[in-house]
Swiss-Prot record:
Name of the protein this chain belongs to: Phosphonates import ATP-binding protein PhnC
NCBIfam families assigned: ABC_phnC, PRK09984.1
Keyword ATP-binding among record annotations: yes
PROSITE patterns named among the record's database cross-references: ABC_TRANSPORTER_1, ABC_TRANSPORTER_2, PHNC
GO cellular component: plasma membrane
Subunit structure: The complex is composed of two ATP-binding proteins (PhnC), two transmembrane proteins (PhnE) and a solute-binding protein (PhnD).
Top EC group: translocase
Subcellular location: Cell inner membrane
Species: Shigella boydii serotype 4 (strain Sb227)
CDD domains per UniProt: ABC_PhnC_transporter
Keyword set, alphabetical order: ATP-binding, Cell inner membrane, Cell membrane, Membrane, Nucleotide-binding, Phosphonate transport, Translocase, Transport
Family that this chain belongs to: Belongs to the ABC transporter superfamily. Phosphonates importer (TC 3.A.1.9.1) family.
Gene Ontology MF annotations: ABC-type phosphonate transporter activity; ATP binding; ATP hydrolysis activity
Catalytic activities: phosphonate(out) + ATP + H2O = phosphonate(in) + ADP + phosphate + H(+)
Amino acid sequence: MQTIIRVEKLAKTFNQHQALHAVDLNIHHSEMVALLGPSGSGKSTLLRHLSGLITGDKSAGSHIELLGRTVQREGRLARDIRKSRAHTGYIFQQFNLVNRLSVLENVLIGALGSTPFWRTCFSWFTREQKQRALQALTRVGMVHFAHQRVSTLSGGQQQRVAIARALMQQAKVILADEPIASLDPESARIVMDTLRDINQNDGITVVVTLHQVDYALRYCERIVALRQGHVFYDGSSQQFDNERFDHLYRSINRIEENAKAA
């Protein structure tokens, strides 16, 4: 099976606090993987390293590859980082959309990387690009909102627009950082249904950080659980049982209680 993401010996330190400890991870083509763990476990930090939004410590042997290209090595970004980012869609908890633009215009932003610079300065997009943007909106059930200002949408609708933008980008990998954290249960279900649909039908690799274990079990075939910057579990979601859940979360609660008592 083709390896899409490869992480070797990744470490990250913030202000003398080590957030990640020599993490090794391989993610394969068309997998849908959940990164789980309590707050501060390192899951979002790990995700942000995958596309080079942040760099790791200058550790000997640390290396991240995405789509066969080096993203960073020993704490330094690759010179051609834009080439690996070109086919990587990033979905944020806070949507990262331009509120003053329409839904369609926000989706067309996904085409900027493949559009000549002089046309991007004037937002001149071709008829074919606009048609692809409408098709992406159709995929996520948002085509009827194409000409509506994005600021008028609900959180769940905005998140689906962000997914459509990733489709417009022709992403081969989607990295979703807490995409349903601020959504109501129905909106969260629709967003996760949408991610699973494009994973299964388009073969797009999806890596998603989640706090909600039930969504990870329902939607993701594989779980990578982090605890205090270490990979605690990496395997099938079917094997992530109550005992592992308790060990992952209760031990953290016990540490916090002891710290307060001290």
